[in-house]
Amino acid sequence: MKKQIWLVLFVLLLGMATSCQKQDVNAVGKAKAGVEADVAAIKALIAEWVRLYNAEDFENVMSVFYAQNAILMSPNAPACRTKEAILLSYQKESELDIQHVDTSVAEDVRICGDSAFAWGIDTGTTTPRSGGDPVPYSVKWLMVFERQANSAWKCLYEMWNDNNPITHLP
């Protein structure tokens, strides 16, 4: 009788373990699909940033791309700690040069709950508004995104620097 009880308990536990494994596989599949959708959404957001930036539509860059409390850390400049400061930075830069992003490739995007981390490389040209030939550039960037209450992603932190080697030393 004891052997039969143990056998029944073993079969029940085995059945429960099998059903839990199936649920876990389904949960993993759903989670993976959610992560893939989030990665695609962030890559689409970056592509929209490129489109708006190239059109010099900086007001829409602010509303579409950046979180309300975003911080931009450009090289050799103080951190821009508000969307208004970021907008002013874009506008001042645009007064001097025409920046055109040819490509922006997100090399890696990692999702962690309501935060995401991405790094990539942009290439393009800078043309002085005062005249002169376009100068090619390549930069690497690192961004942190946060999921908003409406489930949209927005950039919370952005920093970038030149991807080219230093051509002169002080």
List PLM regions with ranges.
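A solvent-exposed, acidic/Ser-Thr-rich amphipathic alpha-helical stretch
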Residues: 39-40, 58-112, 121, 133-136
